[in-house]
A protein has these predicted regions:
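Hydrophobic helix-and-loop "lid/oligomerization" segment in the mid-to-C-terminal part
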Residues: 1-127
């Protein structure tokens, strides 16, 4: 199944800039959900934006960060923190991009969100 989401890693930037990046990404017709992330202190800050009613940003943030940090927010806009050490302990040598993508795909599959597929979006190291 193709996925209609985008994941982008940003060089060190402020949380508000991550939100702006996410807002830009969901302006693309084929992208219903965006996850932007950056290094922050002892881990990574993530920002999630959604324009699809079945893809609640707050629930996705909590799901992605479960066991490695914490996340939450609102239905369309949310954020979270992934602690580097906890991520390494739980996921071994996987990069933050790989962890976010894996957890996001699992969330979509576990929640049977499939009727939205058509065009996939993936952007790594885009900003």
């Amino acid at each position: 199944m193709d996925r209609r989401f985008a994941i982008v890693g940003a060089l060190k930037c402020e949380q508000t800039v991550l939100g702006i990046i996410g807002d830009f990404m969901i302006q693309v017709d084929s992208v219903f959900l965006s996850v932007a992330y950056t290094e922050a202190g002892a881990g990574y800050q993530i920002s999630i934006r959604s324009c699809h009613e079945k893809l609640r940003a707050d629930k996705i943030a909590a799901y992605i960060c479960d066991g490695v940090g914490g996340g939450g927010g609102h239905a369309k806009k949310a954020g979270g923190k992934i602690l580097r050490l906890k991520m390494q302990e739980k996921y071994g040598g996987k990069s933050v991009f790989e962890v976010v993508e894996m957890r996001l795909c699992r969330y979509i599959d576990d929640n049977h969100i499939s009727h939205w597929s058509n065009v996939g979006g993936r952007m790594e190291n885009g900003f």
